[in-house]
């Protein structure tokens, strides 16, 4: 069994979430109805593109790390996440492989998905925030209706998910797209991500493929 500590800190920071605001609580039936609406919206518009800003408070650091960039997502499990600024990175998954590329260091990490490793648990959490497909199988869900959308609190069912994060809160806007997410990890790390300029325009399939540039040092942290 792979240890979660072997994963890249950037990979672990990808899971996205939000705190619950006191509002009109949803019944179990209302939560199920909301998830049906999300599924219908996803079926008609499987693509999401947004800008994001993220703040990570890590137990080993005195100051939070703030980053921003863009994210592209195609349901059910393809995404691309580009962080800009002084420490840029590109994270791409086509549903089978995951790449994390660091252009400043000309290095890339390559992970193979579907091996029931901690990587799969982390990616499942990312997909949950942006997709919510089959979310009831993985999480116990409660929530509330707020003026501009919904706040959901997701508690992981599986041991692998519980090792990845302790708290997973998700805010959806009225278009049923992630607006803010918050995650607390068992090690004390805390990540808050906010999204803006969300669109559902079609995204080219090539967006979710990655080939490391010539001269890139490629590593496989978890092997094959």
Language-model segments: what does each one mean?
Residues 2, 21-64, 212-224:
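N-terminal leader/targeting segments and the immediate start of mature chains
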Residues 8-18:
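Bacterial N-terminal signal peptides
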Residues 25, 109, 134-223:
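Gly/Pro-enriched, hydrophobic low-complexity segments
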Residues 45-47, 66-68, 74-76, 86, ...:
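Extracytoplasmic
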Residues 58-60, 79-80, 87-89, 100, ...:
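Short beta-strands and strand-coil junctions in structured, solvent-facing domains, enriched
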Residues 70-122, 191:
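An acidic-aromatic
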Residues 125-130, 138:
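Anionic-ligand binding region
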């Amino acid at each position: 069994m792979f240890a979660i500590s072997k994963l890249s800190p950037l990979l672990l920071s990808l899971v996205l979430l939000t705190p619950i605001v006191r509002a009109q609580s949803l019944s179990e039936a209302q939560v199920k109805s909301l998830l049906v609406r999300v599924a219908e919206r996803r079926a008609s518009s499987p693509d999401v593109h947004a800008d994001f800003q993220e703040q990570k408070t890590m137990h080993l650091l005195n100051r939070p790390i703030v980053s921003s960039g863009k994210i592209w997502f195609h349901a059910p499990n393809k995404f691309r996440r580009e962080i800009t600024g002084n420490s840029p990175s590109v994270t791409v998954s086509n549903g089978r492989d995951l790449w994390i590329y660091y252009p400043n260091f000309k290095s890339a990490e390559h992970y193979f998905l579907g091996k029931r490793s901690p990587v799969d648990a982390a990616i499942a959490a990312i997909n949950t925030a942006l997709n919510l497909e089959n979310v009831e199988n993985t999480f116990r869900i409660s929530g509330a209706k707020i003026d501009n959308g919904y706040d959901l609190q997701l508690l992981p069912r599986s041991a692998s998910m519980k090792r990845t994060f302790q708290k997973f809160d998700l805010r959806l806007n009225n278009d049923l797209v992630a607006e803010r997410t918050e995650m607390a990890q068992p090690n004390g790390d805390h990540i808050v991500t906010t999204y803006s300029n969300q669109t559902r325009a079609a995204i080219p399939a090539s967006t979710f493929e990655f080939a490391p540039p010539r001269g890139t040092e490629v590593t496989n942290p978890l092997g094959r």
